[in-house]
Amino acid sequence: MSLAKIVHRSEKSFKVEIEVSYKKSMLEGEEAIQEAINQAGCLMTGEMLCQFDTDGSPIMIGGVKWTSKGLISKTYQTPYGEAEIERHIYQSPKGGAGFCPLERDARIILTATPKFAKILASKYAEFGSSRVNDDLEGNHGRKV
């Protein structure tokens, strides 16, 4: 069930609507709020990521014209959960590895957004990996 949706887009911003059902206990209510906020966060992060994509036009890298292979789906890790978007992947005329301008321009680290990478680095510096997973799930509603 979708708890969050984009209800308006303009050139400079977008508006999100969130719906949360009342619950019988406050703890259940807070968990429902966290779920809705995380869903909205994934939706908004995906929208933010898309602003860093190209329009698919050819690009020049080192004097070589690279062309888009089209929109290809990828899932990114965010502080709120996973955000799946379609973005352009480019390839040189010689083939080989593809290049994603969105990932460079949005400063993606492997599949993590900058904020999520910062959160993970801070937690790993303090805890071991199993404790990081427990903390993310217990305190942020975020399974990794």
For each feature predicted by the language model, list its residue ranges.
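Short, positively charged, Gly/Tyr-enriched micro-motifs
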Residues: 10, 83-144
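Short, conserved DNA-binding cores of transcription-related domains
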Residues: 1-93
